[in-house]
């Protein structure tokens, strides 16, 4: 990115400095290897016992554990980092410690806790790493869609939710018994009651609760924030100045340790009466120090230089993670081997992996930790 133009600069917004990027200045596309951002890549084969089988769902990683998210009929499942199945976490259902549709989850290895937040939740479900159901944490407001952080040592829970019209708060901090300690009213962040809208948090920087309230219906000018629970503030950090403010595209923002990243789409296309999909999506990256930026593509140079889809969403909770079924992994290897430019070492690595895969295997998980 050293040769990329300056596309953004910091501007003062009250007491805060916000990186303001100009959409019109984004031009060239750079291809960046995954190794530029991460330390190394592990490929973990998950335990293939019947009780360990998982779908191609979300995954949360810690130093020693892999938490595969639940999706009917499978509950959340906990593995060690070698892929050994340890236990189910909760169950699908409506009873104590059970859940159906889940919006967010956290794996807190240091405190022997797993937290699960269902859609439209009035409580945060709590488990230990042995699979035991613990007392839930009552929430002082119901959460249609929300992201959260738990400070168990400090006895605090921070929540940022999708603030539908009439919501008392967009963000708040409470204790573990549900008593509110501080909150922030929605104000201009209030969103229409449409479940197409989202709350996005990457949690890719230790100690930072980044938040993008993603409004699709309708779109609007907005910012990336950090939630400061101690002072009940959403602090703006980044925004994109759109070339045409009359037609704001679908878009999102995020941040990594040294970069802001984002995406925007061409106008939505109606694929069926009342059913819309976004047009072509563009992903961009901006250096936090220099303001230099460009459109970008991310490719997995640990794995045959295959391009990574949706690069601005490549990392979560400090990791690149891909949960992939064995058949899809075989297809990826076949596609990578078609590239005549990969090294002999890479070709051997891929063919050795290819030979070890059985179609009846459980899923494989690619894991690469973000550099600080």
Regions found by a protein language model. Name each.
Residues 54-58, 100-105, 142-151, 193-204, ...:
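Repeated scaffold domains used in trafficking and secretory/extracellular systems
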Residues 47-56, 75, 84-111, 118:
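Blade-loop segments of beta-propeller domains
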Residues 49-51, 90-98, 138-145, 187-192, ...:
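Short coil/turn segments at the loop-to-beta-strand junctions that recur within blades
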Residues 235-252, 288-317, 330:
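Conserved blade-ending motifs and adjacent loop-strand segments that build the rim/top face
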Residues 3-43:
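Blade/loop signatures of beta-propeller domains
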Residues 100-102, 117-169, 183-192:
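Asp-box/WD-like beta-propeller blade repeats and closely related beta-sheet repeat scaffolds
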Residues 75-76, 121-125, 165-172, 220-225, ...:
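Structural motif
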Residues 19-20, 64-71, 112-118, 155-165, ...:
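Short beta-strand elements that form the blades of beta-propeller/WD-repeat-like
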């Amino acid at each position: 990115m050293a040769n990329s133009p300056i596309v953004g600069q910091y501007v003062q917004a009250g007491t805060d400095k916000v990186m303001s990027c100009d959409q019109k200045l984004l031009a060239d596309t750079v291809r960046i290897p995954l190794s530029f951002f991460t330390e190394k890549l592990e490929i973990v084969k998950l335990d293939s016992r019947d009780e360990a089988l998982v779908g191609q769902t979300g995954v949360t990683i810690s130093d020693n554990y892999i938490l595969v998210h639940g999706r009917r009929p499978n509950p959340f499942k906990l593995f060690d980092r070698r892929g050994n199945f340890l236990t189910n976490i909760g169950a699908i259902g409506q009873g104590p410690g059970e859940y159906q549709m889940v919006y967010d989850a956290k794996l807190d290895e240091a405190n022997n806790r797993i937290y699960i937040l269902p859609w439209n939740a009035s409580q945060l479900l709590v488990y230990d790493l042995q699979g035991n159901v613990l007392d839930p944490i009552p929430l002082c407001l119901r959460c249609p869609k929300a992201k959260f952080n738990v400070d168990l040592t400090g006895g605090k829970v921070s929540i940022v939710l999708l603030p539908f019209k009439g919501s008392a708060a967009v963000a708040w901090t409470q204790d573990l018994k549900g008593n509110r300690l501080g909150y922030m009213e929605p104000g201009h962040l209030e969103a229409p009651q449409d479940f197409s809208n989202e709350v996005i948090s990457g949690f890719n920087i230790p100690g930072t609760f980044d938040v993008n309230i993603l409004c699709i219906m309708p779109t609007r000018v907005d910012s990336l924030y950090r939630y400061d629970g101690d002072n009940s503030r959403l602090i703006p950090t980044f925004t994109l100045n759109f070339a045409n403010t009359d037609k704001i595209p679908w878009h999102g923002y995020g941040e990594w340790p040294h970069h802001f990243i984002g995406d925007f789409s061409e106008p939505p296309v109606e694929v069926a009466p009342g059913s819309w999909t976004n047009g072509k999506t563009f992903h961009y990256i901006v250096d936090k120090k220099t303001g230099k930026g460009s459109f970008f593509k991310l490719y997995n140079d640990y794995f045959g230089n295959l391009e990574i889809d949706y690069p601005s969403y490549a990392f979560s909770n400090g990791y690149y993670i891909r949960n992939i079924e064995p058949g899809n992994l075989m297809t990826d290897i076949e596609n990578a081997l078609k590239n005549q430019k990969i090294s002999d070492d890479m070709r051997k690595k891929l063919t050795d992996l290819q030979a070890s895969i059985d179609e009846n295997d459980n899923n494989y998980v690619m894991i690469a930790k973000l550099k600080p």
